């Protein structure tokens, strides 16, 4: 059996986490098994991962304690790297490529870097680190994957993109989960008290990238035209309270629902009438694919 060490799972069941789990659920686990190296003490889908046979190893996050992170990562790799035929690192920027550096040092022969974004809102220092690591990633990783052609230049220079080890791996979803279902639509619209509303949906963490402020401004104009519009915001994040305050200031609390993190997002699509994703940047937004699979008009 080939064992793959996977990095990319956090405490948030977001886009990258969904991509990883979609593959994990559908691979032949008699031939390939995933283990997960995480820097979060709470891991999305943890129970499911364990039920599928995967192991989860948790280390300190680099942002919490850099030196402890390096010690724990070194200790893990020195004691476990020999078990793995590959490491698959799923990230949105090249600020932290230590997982690949240590994987190379301790002998993991196949080292996959998988790009999941087309830009980043990092400050000056992190942007400089990203650019520096972009120049050297070609000598650290062995395989260079990207979720889209638009995202690739953010991670890879022309030399990498012209090489045989570069590949576009488009995000995959199980379309059957999102098939239109009138019974679910009726059930969820009833639960939310939205039987007669025009439901505008958005799924994403409350973060600068997702552009919630702009979405609220647009929604305010919609409500002026038709009071039956209702905005459904699915997710959580550091800007959630700020967005709630903006909604309050605009007097829209009755027209906007905040659901928090949901593990039944595929069902929430059923109650929507239109899906909006006004992100400042995306690699290949998996929620947009899911919404289209649910036959929703998407903006």
Locations of the language-model features?
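A conserved mid-protein helix/loop that constitutes part of the nucleotide-sugar donor-binding site
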Residues: 14-22, 198, 202-221, 227, ...
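Short hydrophobic beta-strand element within catalytic cores of glycosyltransferases
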Residues: 38, 288, 297-299
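Active-site donor-binding acidic/aromatic loop of nucleotide-activated sugar
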Residues: 239-242, 252-261, 268
């Amino acid at each position: 059996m080939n064992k793959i060490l996977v990095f990319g799972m956090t405490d948030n069941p977001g886009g990258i986490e969904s991509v990883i789990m979609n593959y994990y659920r559908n691979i032949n686990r008699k031939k390939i098994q995933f283990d997960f190296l995480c820097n979060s003490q709470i891991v999305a889908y943890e129970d499911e991962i364990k039920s599928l046979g995967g192991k989860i190893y948790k280390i300190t996050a680099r942002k919490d304690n850099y030196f402890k992170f390096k010690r724990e990562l070194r200790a893990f790799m020195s004691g476990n790297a020999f078990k793995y035929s590959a490491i698959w690192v799923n990230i949105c920027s090249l600020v932290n490529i230590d997982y690949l550096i240590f994987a190379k040092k301790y002998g993991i022969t196949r080292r996959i870097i998988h790009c999941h974004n087309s830009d980043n809102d990092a400050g000056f220092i992190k942007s400089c680190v990203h650019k520096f690591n972009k120049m050297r990633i070609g000598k650290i990783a062995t395989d260079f994957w990207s979720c889209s052609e638009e995202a690739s230049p953010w991670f890879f220079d022309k030399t990498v993109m012209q090489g045989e080890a570069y590949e576009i791996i488009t995000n995959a979803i199980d379309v059957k989960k999102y098939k239109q279902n009138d019974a679910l639509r009726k059930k969820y619209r009833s639960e939310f008290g939205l039987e007669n509303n025009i439901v505008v949906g958005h799924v994403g963490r409350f973060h600068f990238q997702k552009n919630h402020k702009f979405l609220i401004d647009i929604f305010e104009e919609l409500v002026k035209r038709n009071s039956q519009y209702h905005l459904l915001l699915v997710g959580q994040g550091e800007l959630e309270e700020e967005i709630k305050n903006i909604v309050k200031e605009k007097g829209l609390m009755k027209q906007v629902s905040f659901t928090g993190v949901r593990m039944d997002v595929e069902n929430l699509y059923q109650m929507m009438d239109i899906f909006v994703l006004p992100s400042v940047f995306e690699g290949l937004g998996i929620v947009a694919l899911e919404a289209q699979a649910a036959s929703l008009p998407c903006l």
